[in-house]
């Protein structure tokens, strides 16, 4: 992969009932980024989401449910001819503790239905993922109710700190300095 990020998408489910849930931490990331850059996210039906242009890159918060996130990502990417390798997807990560945030280049979906759908719609898994840790409930049968509920106050504070850490590295992501971002986040 080469070049910098031209599309940043933050995954989550639409609606107030999901806004504060663990599954929406990718959307938290994107909303905070838009606020920090003084960008208003405007609803764009053709892109199935809320969109803003921020200098040389696009912000996208899908209005689809998590499992259909690929519709939004692919619509915007195809329209603006953005390659998968120029896309960053911010999403919740069960396999990391709350407070961890890591950058991953390509790979599978790891059981994440939003990523699975994006891979399907793009026809590629060669995009970057900003994996925001939310902890694991301990057993796979508890995953759905867990991700669809708000985090504890301590976890929320840790998640917000991780988001801030990731936001500080947006300039490097846009410039394509992925190795620096990985060094910063993974150490």
UniProtKB/Swiss-Prot annotation:
The record marks 13 as: Discriminates between blocked and unblocked aminoacyl-tRNA. The keyword Plastid does not apply. TRNA binds at residues 18, 65, 67, 113. Its main location: cytoplasm. One of its GO terms (molecular function) is peptidyl-tRNA hydrolase activity. Keywords: Cytoplasm, Hydrolase, RNA-binding, tRNA-binding. The active site is at residue 23. It comes from the Bacteria. It catalyses: an N-acyl-L-alpha-aminoacyl-tRNA + H2O = an N-acyl-L-amino acid + a tRNA + H(+). Coiled coil: none annotated. It is found in: Cytoplasm. The record marks 92 as: Stabilizes the basic form of H active site to accept a proton. InterPro entries: Pept_tRNA_hydro, Pept_tRNA_hydro_CS, Pept_tRNA_hydro_sf. Its EC number is 3.1.1.29. Transmembrane segments: none annotated. It is an enzyme of class 3 (hydrolase). GO terms for biological process: protein quality control for misfolded or incompletely synthesized proteins; rescue of stalled ribosome. Belongs to the PTH family. Monomer. Hydrolyzes ribosome-free peptidyl-tRNAs (with 1 or more amino acids incorporated), which drop off the ribosome during protein synthesis, or as a result of ribosome stalling. Catalyzes the release of premature peptidyl moieties from peptidyl-tRNA molecules trapped in stalled 50S ribosomal subunits, and thus maintains levels of free tRNAs and 50S ribosomes. This is Peptidyl-tRNA hydrolase. The lineage of its organism: Bacteria, Pseudomonadati, Pseudomonadota, Gammaproteobacteria, Legionellales. The gene is pth.
